[in-house]
């Protein structure tokens, strides 16, 4: 079975947690990009028949996403409020627009990287949605695999859902600068850090 994740996260999650799982699973992919490139969720949809939700704010990436996936695809950014927000649309060699993110939550520690490598950037307006509202609208209470890749604001996303009310088994979260607040939050809900991929993509489970 083909792996699609940047560093083999999907294959590791499958082998470690779901290889013997009976029945269909469910994923939520926040920051799904085009649905294929470095995707943490496509493996489960394509090879195992899982259903789920893919969320991507960039209009061009979203058009590719909804053409490549069978999951529910939503064109918005996940935030701690509903409304509209400014989104930094960045072009980077070899990474395309994958360093893009909400302006209000953009990780300023990326700036040095952007100044060195980016070939262009612009501000666009995107819809904002709360993750809890998205889950409730789709009748989702149990998530086998939650993947969060947002270039800043990951902690806000994790705090925006009550992890006591939603049954989330495995969580991948990008933590580029090893912010302790992310691990402290998840450890407080009984999660354990299972593995860190490439020094920045953390995998938690309970």
Give residue spans per PLM region.
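Phosphate/nucleotide-binding beta-alpha loop and adjacent structural elements of enzyme active sites
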Residues: 1-206
């Amino acid at each position: 079975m083909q792996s699609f994740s940047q560093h083999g996260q999907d294959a590791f999650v499958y082998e470690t947690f779901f290889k013997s799982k009976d029945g269909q699973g469910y994923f939520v992919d926040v920051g799904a990009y085009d649905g294929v490139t470095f995707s943490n969720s496509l493996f489960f949809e394509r090879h195992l028949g899982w259903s789920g939700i893919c969320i991507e704010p960039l209009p061009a990436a979203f058009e590719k996403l909804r053409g490549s996936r069978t999951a529910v695809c939503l064109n918005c950014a996940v935030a701690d409020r509903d409304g509209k927000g400014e989104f930094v649309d960045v072009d980077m060699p070899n990474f395309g627009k994958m360093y893009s993110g909400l302006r209000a939550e953009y990780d300023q520690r990326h700036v040095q990287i952007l100044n060195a490598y980016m070939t262009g950037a612009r501000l666009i307006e995107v819809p904002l949605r709360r993750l809890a509202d998205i889950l409730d609208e789709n009748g989702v209470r149990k998530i086998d695999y939650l993947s969060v890749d947002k270039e800043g604001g990951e902690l806000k996303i994790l705090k925006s859902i009550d992890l006591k009310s939603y049954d989330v088994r495995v969580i991948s979260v990008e933590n580029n600068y090893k912010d302790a607040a992310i691990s402290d939050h998840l450890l407080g809900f009984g999660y354990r850090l299972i593995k860190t991929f490439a020094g920045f993509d953390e995998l938690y489970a309970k």
